[in-house]
């Protein structure tokens, strides 16, 4: 389907606990509020892109429990194609507990549940869908074998571009194999430094602070190392984003145009990625413009509580 985005990965049922400060080990504290929301990186990214008007298909697996039933209804309400959302019996849906402090920072504990049962056959069932998409978007929350398989299938097609959100990062060799099939890599600063250190056996950078030029040089070296990368995008929170491309004339630091009052940063990275995919694929904007537009969407999300509940629709973007 023309300008179609397919997302492979995890769906979660999120429980948010709000606190004034994070508890220390062994400490019991009183929370200030509790909310539930839909989550999971793949689900979040698909929902945000769909809210902005993209045609999105999600490949994920749910449990046959109340949270799974509600999650499936949520996808349908958000106009996501659920043809490849499968349901498994006697296994709980994925879930996450998210602790958010008064500054909007968070700690997260994830239980994979049904997400851990997403398999290569599920991806094979969606082969035609993937290969006829304009973009395949993946993360690392489900089996790495499944993610690798999806990326390989996508690159068998000349049409489908691939985007990998390298989180949660680890040092599994399968990730290096994935890089052979990735066009656009998206990382945050910590993930970039971790990837750079493991790639170049550099153990001296873990505690250092890096300036923008040093981070861009890391990206440039990674693009030279992994020749399939066309672009690396680095999210820097309140400091904006970096774009580093094979075409060096596109390299830039995109700073935030306005500061906002942060309430909750949960899911903001997914909001940015889903929005970026939308603007790049559906609206066919250039890379830099897509990043700027996505940054604006994500900056709205951090002014609201929750993950998907914080995501703006297209008519809320000025």
Swiss-Prot record:
Indicate the residues that form the catalytic site.
270 (proton acceptor)
State which pathway it belongs to: Carbohydrate metabolism; D-ribose degradation; D-ribose 5-phosphate from beta-D-ribopyranose: step 2/2
Give the principal location in a single coarse category: cytoplasm
Q: Name one GO cellular component term.
A: cytoplasm
Task: List the SUPFAM superfamilies hit by this protein, alphabetically.
Answer: Ribokinase-like (SSF53613)
Q: Regulation of activity: what does the record state? A: Activated by a monovalent cation that binds near, but not in, the active site. The most likely occupant of the site in vivo is potassium. Ion binding induces a conformational change that may alter substrate affinity.
UniProt KW Cell division keyword:
no
Co-factor binding details? Requires a divalent cation, most likely magnesium in vivo, as an electrophilic catalyst to aid phosphoryl group transfer. It is the chelate of the metal and the nucleotide that is the actual substrate.
Supply the Pfam families for this chain. Answer: PfkB
Catalyzed reaction equations: D-ribose + ATP = D-ribose 5-phosphate + ADP + H(+)
Protein task: Catalyzes the phosphorylation of ribose at O-5 in a reaction requiring ATP and magnesium. The resulting D-ribose-5-phosphate can then be used either for sythesis of nucleotides, histidine, and tryptophan, or as a component of the pentose phosphate pathway.
What protein family is recorded?
Answer: Belongs to the carbohydrate kinase PfkB family. Ribokinase subfamily.
Protein name stated in the entry: Ribokinase
Q: What is the lineage of its organism?
A: Eukaryota, Amoebozoa, Evosea, Eumycetozoa, Dictyostelia
The gene designation is: rbsk
